[in-house]
């Protein structure tokens, strides 16, 4: 039995060895050895190749004997898109399902290192492995991969180039002293070309208009029989419709708090006697109960706030194709709301804002009137600056800045604006391109004129729906909050319709009540501090008038009051020493007020007094009665990096996140609903102001304004 078992093992081993030898010798050629090496190694530079990108129509026009500039804008636009339409195999592969950007393609050394390691592992048991030049094989493969990525980039470059011209021709009525004039959309060829290229350039658009509900009646979209182009329908539906307010319902907020916050905002609008009509936009179904709740708040009789609000609900879901509905984000809701609103000029308010002035005043800004946009800057928190970069981060930022913006041919043929350092918006935008900041925009309040910004809004839509998870995701979404508000200004930047993108000159500020000096950071003597979950914005006309604040502090108070109150108590109570009567000592000489020491000197201290430690709760009591009390405003310094304090015990940055408050809404803390909002402390000076530090500004709020703000905050807090 043992002999048979031993023989079985020997035979099995021989057969297995023979099988392995046979398998190695007779493998298919493609599996036995790598592809043959091309003796002439192709050297391909992905970044330098971008300098050769060219719009194909411009390339033809440059060689043409007749200049397109000799014709009017309508003829020139028709010629451009007619040539593009007849171009052989014209197609925008905007989202090739078979292609995905490999970020390491932008890091040649790392790509080659990993590929060589992989090849050596793959052919570890190949008897001819010593004959293979894995270095050369990897370089040849990298050249192929780089070329494929370059083709992908070229396709994106041409897509944005064509959309920019489309926007100039069909999606703007902004002359702005532009001597090219405005296209005649009554031209049948223009109408047909517009219709054809909407489907090619903006495939996320379904071709349908939103559904409006006014006075509890749904109204079908109003279509103009004179045009078949959805872009022209959008423009005509809002032309001459005046000004209004848009309040978007964010899809990522699934809590009922959103409806409550919007209801409170509408109450504040009534308190401000707002007369602008309101559109509440949404993508997902809003319940009839929520609609009724908001409708009642807006239109119910009130002796205290008699100005009823004109409110409509706008269902945006018909406007996009089913393929992109899964990629709806907060910023894309704002984009869609701006494109499909019935207003020509509009203010977008998010659920967290408390306006402090009449909203019609925002439209009076002269820079807005000229350029059609007005953004407020988000708080200049250093956490918005990227310090850990995705692979390809800088290469994609360079691609956006140098390839996607209007070039000299866009300027020459269509008088689109090139961006340069002489433009006022560049100082702000440099924070994105040169200092790696994200979230430049405070989404609390945004102002658009559709006739001047529709082209850029359509480009923002392409960013959102076509490239949201590929190339630009490497740069745009490299942020902890994963928000994409930068697409809103980038669309305007790339469109070239307006010479400037208008930002408020000031960055966000912190309104509130000063932290008592006893509770300031250790050894801080120069700075003032205000701590809150809310921020605000100042007018850039006088730099001191408060325009609006956010309600985050009040939401924390309402939704997590017990826990939030305990944290605020720790923050604002402070100890002080007080002289009190010492009842344990009986002094028979009540007329003696001084004592003489052994040296014959008198002591001023009364021996009948004791130093007693006290706790001062006066500031905390103010906050309990008014959770967002505005006595002072701090306009902190704007930084691009922390200040090296060099042993000087002052803050090294302007906005300091308070980690203790992050527990709000977690683990049942506060017995509230939903997640709490972050809590920050803001400082009026950073470092040593006499040396390397920077000083900001503190503003005392006058009593009359304090009363006004208190009234509006109380309106917001009302149930």
UniProtKB/Swiss-Prot annotation:
Sequence ranges on the Cytoplasmic membrane side: 1-4
Catalytic EC class: transferase
Transmembrane region(s): 5-22
Keyword Cell membrane belongs to the record: no
Protein name (Swiss-Prot/TrEMBL): Putative alpha-1,3-mannosyltransferase MNT4
Function (record text): Responsible for addition of the terminal mannose residues to the outer chain of core N-linked polysaccharides and to O-linked mannotriose. Implicated in late Golgi modifications.
Glycan attachment residues as annotated in the record: 148, 273, 449
Pfam families, A to Z: Mannosyl_trans3
GO cellular component: Golgi apparatus; Golgi membrane
């Amino acid at each position: 039995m043992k002999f048979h078992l031993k023989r079985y093992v020997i035979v099995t081993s021989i057969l297995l060895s023979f099988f392995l030898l046979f398998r190695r010798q007779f493998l298919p050629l493609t599996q036995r050895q790598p592809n043959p090496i091309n003796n002439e190694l192709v050297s391909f530079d992905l970044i330098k190749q971008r300098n050769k990108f060219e719009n194909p129509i411009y390339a033809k026009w440059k060689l043409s004997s007749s200049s397109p500039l000799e014709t009017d804008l309508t003829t020139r636009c028709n010629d451009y898109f007619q040539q593009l339409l007849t171009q052989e195999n014209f197609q925008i592969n905007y989202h090739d399902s078979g292609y995905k950007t490999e970020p390491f393609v932008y890091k040649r050394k790392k790509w080659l290192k990993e590929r060589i390691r992989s090849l050596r592992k793959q052919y570890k048991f190949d008897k001819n492995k010593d004959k293979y030049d894995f270095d050369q094989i990897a370089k040849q493969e990298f050249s192929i991969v780089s070329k494929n990525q370059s083709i992908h980039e070229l396709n994106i470059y041409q897509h944005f180039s064509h959309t920019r011209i489309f926007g100039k021709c069909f999606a703007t009525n902004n002359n702005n002293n532009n001597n090219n004039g405005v296209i005649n959309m009554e031209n049948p060829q223009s109408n047909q070309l517009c219709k054809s290229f909407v489907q090619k350039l903006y495939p996320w658009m379904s071709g349908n208009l939103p559904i409006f509900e006014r006075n509890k009646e749904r109204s079908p979209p109003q279509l103009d029989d004179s045009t078949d182009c959805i872009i022209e329908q959008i423009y005509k539906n809002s032309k001459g419709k005046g000004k209004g307010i848009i309040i978007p319902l964010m899809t990522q907020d699934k809590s009922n708090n959103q409806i409550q916050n919007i209801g409170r905002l509408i109450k504040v609008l009534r308190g401000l006697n707002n007369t602008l009509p309101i559109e509440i936009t949404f993508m997902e179904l809003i319940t009839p109960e929520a609609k009724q709740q908001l409708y009642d708040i807006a239109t119910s009789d009130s002796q205290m706030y008699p100005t009823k609000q004109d409110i409509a609900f706008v269902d945006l879901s018909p406007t996009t194709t089913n393929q992109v509905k899964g990629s709806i984000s907060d910023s894309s809701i704002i984009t869609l709301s701006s494109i499909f609103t019935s207003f020509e000029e509009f203010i977008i308010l998010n659920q967290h804002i408390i306006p402090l002035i009449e909203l019609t005043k925002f439209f009076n800004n002269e820079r807005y009137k000229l350029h059609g946009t007005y953004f407020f800057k988000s708080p200049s928190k250093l956490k918005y600056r990227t310090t850990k970069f995705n692979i390809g981060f800088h290469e994609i930022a360079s691609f956006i800045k140098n390839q996607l913006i209007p070039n000299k041919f866009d300027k020459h043929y269509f008088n689109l604006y090139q961006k340069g350092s002489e433009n006022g918006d560049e100082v702000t935008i440099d924070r994105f391109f040169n200092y790696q900041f994200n979230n430049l925009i405070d989404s609390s309040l945004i102002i658009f004129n559709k006739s001047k910004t529709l082209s850029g809004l359509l480009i923002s839509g392409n960013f959102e729906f076509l490239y949201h998870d590929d190339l630009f995701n490497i740069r745009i979404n490299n942020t902890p909050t994963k928000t994409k508000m930068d697409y809103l200004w980038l669309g305007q930047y790339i469109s070239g319709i307006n010479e400037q993108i208008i930002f408020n000159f000031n960055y966000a500020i912190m309104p509130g009540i000063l932290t008592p000096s006893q509770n300031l950071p250790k050894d801080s003597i120069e700075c003032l501090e205000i701590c809150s979950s809310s921020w605000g914005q100042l007018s850039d006309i006088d730099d001191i008038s408060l325009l609006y604040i956010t309600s985050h502090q009040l939401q924390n108070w309402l939704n997590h009051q017990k826990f939030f109150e305990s944290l605020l108590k720790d923050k604002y109570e402070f100890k002080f020493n007080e002289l009190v009567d010492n009842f344990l000592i009986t002094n028979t000489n009540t007329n003696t007020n001084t004592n003489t020491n052994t040296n014959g000197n008198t002591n001023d201290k009364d021996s009948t007094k004791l130093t007693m430690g006290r706790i001062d709760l006066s500031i905390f009591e103010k906050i309990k009665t008014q959770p967002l009390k505005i006595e002072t405003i701090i306009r902190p310094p704007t930084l691009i990096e922390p200040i090296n304090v060099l042993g000087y015990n002052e803050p090294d940055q302007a906005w300091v996140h308070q980690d203790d408050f992050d527990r709000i809404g977690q683990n049942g803390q506060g017995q509230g609903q939903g997640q709490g909002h972050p809590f920050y402390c803001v400082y009026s000076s950073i470092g040593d102001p006499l040396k390397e530090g920077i000083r900001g500004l503190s503003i005392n709020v006058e009593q009359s304004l304090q009363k006004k703000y208190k009234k509006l905050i109380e309106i917001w807090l009302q149930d």
